[in-house]
Regions:
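Non-transmembrane, aqueous-exposed alpha-helical and coiled segments at domain scale
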Residues: 1-185
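Conserved small/polar residues in nucleotide/adenosyl-binding loops
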Residues: 186-193
Length: 194
């Protein structure tokens, strides 16, 4: 059994919260660069070019890629042979988010209750997803969920007879309706093992 101190979790989440807002992951950066090279429409090409330029500036200056630094979504794979000591895991993750958003000068936009709209002023609580896996490691990934992208979501009740084709059509229609408005989805450049 491997023992991990909660301080390691806090430090890792703090660092990933900052990195996820400053740097695009390589696969996303490469996909945007490829799209820009292949884009024939000048306006779309210019937009893709600006996204690439913005990501370079953000990385160089160590500033957020986007002003909407989102709600921290934290994905945690916990090995079943891990024992965490020194505190509560959920509290540690939220403390890491709190420290990361403070030290990284990231906008704090999470509210305690959506109806009362009172800001927590530290961007917690994070959305945390746990997955128990074999082994003795903890793997953590942070993905800031920008609220602009959330405003583009839709829901539908499809009939069973719509099948997979109905799902595909709904997704494509949602993308078409949203147009250029949603934010890019990005995550911490690489998940971190602790």
């Amino acid at each position: 059994m491997r023992i991990i101190n909660i301080k390691e979790i806090i430090k890792t989440v703090k660092e990933l919260s900052i990195e996820a807002n400053y740097y695009l992951p390589d696969d996303i950066k490469e996909a945007i660069e490829k799209a820009e090279k292949n884009e024939k429409w000048p306006i779309a090409n210019n937009i893709l070019n600006k996204i690439i330029e913005n990501s370079h500036i953000a990385a160089r200056e160590k500033i957020p890629i986007c002003q909407d630094t989102g709600m921290a979504c934290v994905f945690v794979d916990i090995g079943q042979d891990v024992h965490i000591i020194g505190g509560n895991l959920e509290e540690a993750i939220n403390e890491g988010v709190r420290q990361g958003y403070e030290e990284g000068f990231l906008r704090k936009s999470v509210v305690k209750d959506p109806l009362h709209r009172v800001n927590t002023n530290d961007n917690t609580p994070a959305l945390i997803y746990y997955n128990i896996v074999p082994g003795d490691k903890v793997k953590i990934m942070v993905s800031p969920k920008g609220f602009g992208s959330e405003n583009m979501s839709r829901i539908a009740m499809l009939k069973p007879s719509d099948g997979l084709e109905g799902v595909k059509n709904f997704v494509l229609e949602t993308v078409r309706i949203a147009g250029p408005n949603p934010c890019l989805l990005y995550t911490s450049p690489s998940p971190r093992d602790t």
